[in-house]
Amino acid sequence: MDIPIPTRQLFINGDWKAPVLNKRIPVINPATQNIIGDIPAATKEDVDVAVAAAKTALTRNKGADWATASGAVRARYLRAIAAKVTEKKPELAKLESIDCGKPLDEAAWDIDDVAGCFEYYADLAEKLDARQKAPVSLPMDTFKSHVLREPIGVVGLITPWNYPMLMATWKVAPALAAGCAAILKPSELASLTCLELGEICKEVGLPPGVLNILTGLGPEAGAPLATHPDVDKVAFTGSSATGSKIMTAAAQLVKPVSLELGGKSPLVVFEDVDLDKAAEWAIFGCFWTNGQICSATSRLILHESIATEFLNRIVKWIKNIKISDPLEEGCRLGPVVSEGQYEKILKFVSNAKSEGATILTGGSRPEHLKKGFFIEPTIITDVTTNMQIWREEVFGPVLCVKTFSTEEEAIDLANDTVYGLGAAVISNDLERCERVTKAFKAGIVWVNCSQPCFTQAPWGGVKRSGFGRELGEWGLDNYLSVKQVTQYISEEPWGWYQPPAKL
C-alpha cells in the first residue's frame, strides 16, 4: 500500500533549503517496490553550510539562546517537540512503515518512544542546572573546587534505517538537552520521519541552527560530516566497517566518537523453561523489526534435552506470524528495507546451506507475496561455529541454532563472537541466570526475555560492537564536557618562591 509523502528539502538553520547541487534520491516502498517520492541528497557543500549554522547557534547572543541557556529553557523546547510528535503520531507511524517496511503497530510503538525520549531528556536538562558547580572535596582547605558540565559543541549524528526516527531521537534529544547544536544525517534508506522532525522543530520555534537535518548518501554527506574540522564530536550507529572508518577519520583531528555497531547476540535457553514462553521470546528476539535489529538474539543456544521439542514449538509459532504489507492490520513481519538487503540475506541463507547447515523453515520469499522485499522467518540448524551464519551479522529474519549440554559450554558458545552488544538467558533458576549474566561478554543482558529497551537504562556494547553508552543519564553525559574549576581561597601568599627583596 502506498500513501502520499511530503516533499521536503534539507533542514538548515531553521528553514528548508534545497541542496547546493540540487540532487535528490528516490524513496522506494519496500512492500510494493514502487517509487513513492524522493528526498534531498546533501553533499559536502551542504555540510559546510549546516556546520556553520550550528556554530552560529552556539554563539548567538553570547550563547544565551542555547549553549549557555538554562537547562529549564532547553527543556521547554524538548517538551514541545514531544507534544508535537504525539499529536502527529498517526501520520508519522505510517511514514515510518512505508519507508522502512516496519509493521504499523511497531512503528506506532516507536513513535510513542520518540515522544517519551524527548520528555525524559527534558527532565534531565532541568536536573542539569542543579548539577552545575557540584563541589569537589579536596585535601587542602586553602582551595575549593567545583565542576561545570558544558556542551561539547557542534555534534554530528549519523543514524541507521531500522529505527529511523527513534534512533535519531536517542542522539538528538540528549545532545539538545546538553546544549549542543547538532547535524543529523539519517540513512538514505529511511529518512522521511527524520525530515518531519525538522518540520516539528520549525513549528515549536527551536532556535535556528540548533538542529540541522541532512539527508543523503554516506560517502557524499556522512563522510564530510564525520571529517569536518568544526564538528566537535561524532555519534554513529551502524555497521562495524563504517564505524571503523569514522574512528580513523576522527583520530586525525583527535575528535571524540561514540559508536553503536553490529552484533551477533546469543539467546541461551536452559532445560527448565516453559517452552511456549521461551519460544515466543526467541522469535521476538530475532524477528522483531523484520529481524533488522543490531541487538537481535540471532544465535539460539538450546539445551540438548529440549532442542527437538523446542524447535517444533518455534516452527508452529512462526507459521502463525502474519507476513504482509506493513500497513495491514495484524502484520507482524513486513519486508526488509531494500533490494540490496533482501539479496544479502538470501545470500547468507544460501551460503549456510552450501556449508552444510539445514534450513529447518523459511529461507525464501513467502508464496503469497509476489512483490516487495519479503523473506520468511528462517531457522537454520546443524550449524558449526566456523560457519558464516554463526559468525557474521545477517540483519534479517534469520535465526541459527546450536545445542549445549553444560552451563560452561553454553557460556563458551555465547561468547564465541567478536561482537558484544546484547545477550540473553532464559531459565527458571535465577541463581544460574545470575552466573550466566556475569559470564556474558556483552553490554546489555536480558534475563527471561529478549530485546526490551527503556529510555532510562544504558544502551551500548563491548568488543567490536562499539563503545560509549546511549540512553539514561549516560546518554546525556555523551554530549557534556566536564570542566574543573579550582580557586585559591586563602588570604596568605602561596609562599613557594622566595619573594624578591623589598626596595
UniProtKB/Swiss-Prot annotation:
Q: What is its EC number?
A: 1.2.1.-, 1.2.1.19, 1.2.1.54
Species annotation: Pisum sativum (Garden pea)
Q: Does the keyword Ubl conjugation apply?
A: no
What family does the Swiss-Prot or TrEMBL record give for this protein?
Answer: Belongs to the aldehyde dehydrogenase family.
Localization in the cell: Peroxisome
What SUPFAM superfamilies does this protein map onto? ALDH-like (SSF53720)
**GO terms of biological process kind:** cellular detoxification of aldehyde; glycine betaine biosynthetic process from choline
Domain of life of the source: Eukaryota
Q: Give the protein name, as stated in the record.
A: Aminoaldehyde dehydrogenase 2, peroxisomal
**Active site: which residues?**
E260, C294
> Main subcellular localization, coarse class?
other
Q: How does it assemble?
A: Forms homodimers.
Binding residues for NAD(+), per the UniProt record? W161, K185, S239
What pathway does this protein act in?
A: Amine and polyamine biosynthesis; betaine biosynthesis via choline pathway; betaine from betaine aldehyde: step 1/1
Per UniProt, the enzyme's principal EC class comes to oxidoreductase
Catalyzed reaction equations: 3-aminopropanal + NAD(+) + H2O = beta-alanine + NADH + 2 H(+); 4-aminobutanal + NAD(+) + H2O = 4-aminobutanoate + NADH + 2 H(+); 4-guanidinobutanal + NAD(+) + H2O = 4-guanidinobutanoate + NADH + 2 H(+)
- Briefly state the protein's biological role: Dehydrogenase that catalyzes the oxidation of several aminoaldehydes. Metabolizes and detoxifies aldehyde products of polyamine degradation to non-toxic amino acids. Catalyzes the oxidation of 3-aminopropanal to beta-alanine. Catalyzes the oxidation of 4-aminobutanal to 4-aminobutanoate. Catalyzes the oxidation of 4-guanidinobutanal to 4-guanidinobutanoate.
What keywords would UniProt list here?
Metal-binding, NAD, Nucleotide-binding, Oxidoreductase, Peroxisome, Sodium
**Signal peptide location in the record?**
none
Q: Give the Gene Ontology MF terms in alphabetical order.
A: aminobutyraldehyde dehydrogenase (NAD+) activity; gamma-guanidinobutyraldehyde dehydrogenase (NAD+) activity; nucleotide binding; protein homodimerization activity; sodium ion binding
Q: Which CDD domains match?
A: ALDH_F10_BADH
Q: Which residues bind Na(+)?
A: I28, D99, L189
Instruction: Specify whether Acyltransferase is a keyword of the entry.
Output: no
Record site: Transition state stabilizer: N162
> For the motif Microbody targeting signal, what are the positions?
501-503
